[in-house]
Amino acid sequence: MPQFGILCKTPPKVLVRQFVERFERPSGEKIALCAAELTYLCWMITHNGTAIKRATFMSYNTIISNSLSFDIVNKSLQFKYKTQKATILEASLKKLIPAWEFTIIPYYGQKHQSDITDIVSSLQLQFESSEEADKGNSHSKKMLKALLSEGESIWEITEKILNSFEYTSRFTKTKTLYQFLFLATFINCGRFSDIKNVDPKSFKLVQNKYLGVIIQCLVTETKTSVSRHIYFFSARGRIDPLVYLDEFLRNSEPVLKRVNRTGNSSSNKQEYQLLKDNLVRSYNKALKKNAPYSIFAIKNGPKSHIGRHLMTSFLSMKGLTELTNVVGNWSDKRASAVARTTYTHQITAIPDHYFALVSRYYAYDPISKEMIALKDETNPIEEWQHIEQLKGSAEGSIRYPAWNGIISQEVLDYLSSYINRRI
C-alpha cells in the first residue's frame, strides 16, 4: 500500500490516474490495495484540497480499510467514511469511473446508526422505567459501589483523594490546582467544566442562615447551556473549601476566556475563566497514577466525575435525595442513575441547610428533619453573622495580587481575614 509520504508527494493528476487504472482491469488484489488512495482522494474532495495530517490520514484510512467491500462482477464498491457529504463523494467517484457504482456509508464512530424512532423509544423507556435507566450506567455504579464498600466514610475517601495529590508533582501550583478542582466538584456536585468556566468577576458574598457568609460565583457556559452557581464556604476539619480556595488564588493567575465559536458566544462578554481547558487531562492522569483506590486505575473508571459521584452518594445515604435533585437540578421523576449522569444545571435556589450539612458544623436529625449545631468555634457564624461585619479589612489585595481588579475586593478581603483567623 502506498505510504502517506508518497501520496503527499504525488501530483493530484497522477494520483487520480493511478486510481482509475486500478479499475480498468480490476482484480481483488488491486481493489483491496486502493484504500490509501481512496482516503486521500475523499479528503481532497470533501475539504477542497486542504492538506491532511498524518494522524488524520491514518485514522480515516483505517476506517476505509476495515469497511471496504467490492464486487468485481457487478462493478460495485462500498466503504465507510467520516463525512456528511456522502452523496457528493459518490458523485465525484462516479465521475472518475462511470462504469462502477460507489456506495459510501457515513461513519459516526458507532457500530450502526439508530433510527430516530428507536432513539425516541429508548429514551421514553428510560424516562418511564428506572430499571431501564439503570442499565446504561451499570458500569459506573458498580465501580462506585466497590469504592463505597471499603468501609470508609465519604469524608475519609475525600481526604484520601486530596492527600494523593501531594505525590502528584513536585510543583506546589500543580498540586494546588488538582486539590482545588476535586474539592470544588465535590462540594458543588458539579462537572469539571462547571468549575473551569466560572467567571471570576462574578464572585460575591451572600448571606447564609447557618454559616453566616459564603462565597457565590456564576458559570454561564455549561454542558446543558443553562447557567448555575458555584459556592465556596467554611467547613469543619481539613476538608475546608475556603482553605483550598485561598491556596488556589495564591498559586494561580486568571485564565483568559477561551473563545466559544458556537452557541451564544456573541452575547457572552466574559473575559476570564477559572481554569485552563486542558487541566482535566493531567488531572485524570494524576488520579490514575497515584490512585488511593484501585478503581481509579480502571480505564473507564470515575476520575474527573468522582467528586459529584461522591456528593450524590453522600446525600443519598443521608436520605436527602431532594437535595440531590436541587443541587443537580434533576426532576423528581428521574432521580435515578440517569439523573446522576445527566447533571443538568440551572440557577436554582439551594437551601441553606445543604451548606450546613456539607460543612459538618451541623448534624442532620432524620426524625425532626432539622440541623443540629455542633459546638465548634471555627464555625464562621460564631464571629461573622452578617456581611456588614466584614467591612474595613484591606488584606485581600496583598494576599492575592494576581486577582486584584478581577475578583471583588470584598471577597478577597473576606477570604484573607478568614484564613488569618483560621490559622
Swiss-Prot record:
Q: Where is the Tyr recombinase Flp-type domain?
A: 136-422
Q: Which Gene3D superfamilies match?
A: FLP Recombinase, lambda integrase-like, N-terminal domain (domain 1), Intergrase catalytic core
Mutating H305Q: what's the consequence? Reduced activity
Q: Name one GO molecular function term.
A: single-stranded DNA binding
Task: Supply the alphabetized keyword list.
Answer: DNA integration, DNA recombination, DNA-binding, Plasmid
Q: Which CDD domains match?
A: INT_Flp_C
PROSITE patterns recorded:
TYR_RECOMBINASE_FLP (PS51899)
Alphabetically, which GO biological process terms does the record hold? plasmid recombination
Superkingdom as given in the UniProt entry: Eukaryota
**A Pfam family matched in the record:** Flp_N
InterPro entries for this protein: DNA_brk_join_enz (IPR011010), Integrase-like_cat_sf (IPR013762), Recombinase_Flp_C (IPR005626), Recombinase_Flp_N (IPR022647)
DNA-binding: is it a keyword of this entry? Answer: yes
Q: What does the UniProt induction comment state?
A: Repressed by the negative regulatory complex REP1-REP2.
> Which residues are responsible for catalysis?
Y343 (o-(3'-phospho-dna)-tyrosine intermediate)
Hey, which family's this protein in?
A: Belongs to the 'phage' integrase family.
Extra facts: The plasmid 2-micron circle is a extrachromosomal element that resides in the nucleus and propagates itself stably in host cell populations. It provides no obvious advantage to the host but imposes no significant disadvantage either at its steady-state copy number of 40-60 molecules/cell.
On subunit structure and binding partners, the annotation says: Homotetramer.
- What the protein does? Part of the plasmid amplification system, which corrects any decrease in copy number caused by a rare missegregation event. Catalyzes the recombination between the large inverted repetitions of the 2-micron plasmid during plasmid replication. This recombination event changes the direction of one of the two replication forks in the bidirectionally replicating molecule, effectively resulting in multiple rounds of replication from a single initiation event. Binds specifically to the FLP recognition target (FRT) site where it induces DNA to bend. Three types of bend exist.
In Swiss-Prot or TrEMBL terms, this protein is called Site-specific recombinase Flp
User: Which species is the source of this protein?
Assistant: Saccharomyces cerevisiae (strain ATCC 204508 / S288c)
Task: Give the classification, highest ranks.
Answer: Eukaryota, Fungi, Dikarya, Ascomycota, Saccharomycotina
